Amino acid sequence: LYMNTLTVPGVLLAALLAWTLLSHGEVTARAFPPLMKVFGSYTKMAVDRGVFWGDIVSSLTSAGIGFALGFLFGVPVAFLMAWYRPVRNIIEPWIQFIRNIPPLAYVPLVVIAVGVGRVPQVIVIWIATFLTMTITIYQGVRNVDETLIKAARVLGAKDSDLFIKVIFPATTPFILTAVRLGSSVALTTLI
């Protein structure tokens, strides 16, 4: 614990020192402006013009909407893929193909299709989060212990009971993992 409490400030201090040294070099001064100049620009943007916080809110709104859409579409698609083989046979090859393409590769296509603004941001974030969350939740549903499903069937559980009382609770850790991964992907794609 003691080592960790010193490590973080030490690393930050070393990074600031390296930045300061690099900002005084002839070649590196353009890539690393002095710290005080950076903080001055931040102050000007945040306080004087007030654009900094507005831009942060706008960006996080885009990420939040894209994430929410990815979650709302990803959960049912994942459950349908895991539960019904015909659905899986149709959707899974497409998801496996599309998920290997970096989300940023969609930007030109989306901009051509819908124009510039918040909508293309949301669409690209939605695609990225949808794919990540769908695969994660799908794996969770597929990994539900078969013994639990058989036991519920023997006890007379209908499909709706099976879903609500067995599959959904057993898949909850995967859903939470999908939320964590999806939020990371949303913010990474936003940047």
Predicted segments, located by residue:
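Transmembrane alpha-helical segments of polytopic membrane transport and secretion proteins
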Residues: 1-13
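Short helix-capping/hinge motifs at transmembrane helix termini and TM-loop junctions
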Residues: 23, 27, 81-86, 114-116, ...
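Periplasmic/extracellular loop-to-transmembrane helix junction in inner-membrane transport proteins
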Residues: 24-68
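Hydrophobic alpha-helical elements at and bordering transmembrane segments
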Residues: 52, 56, 60, 90-97, ...
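Transmembrane-helix boundary motif in ABC transporter permease subunits
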Residues: 65-95
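Generic hydrophobic transmembrane alpha-helix motif, especially the helices
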Residues: 96-132, 139-140
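Transmembrane alpha-helices
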Residues: 123, 127, 160-191
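Short helix-to-coil transition segments within interhelical loops
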Residues: 141-144, 151-171
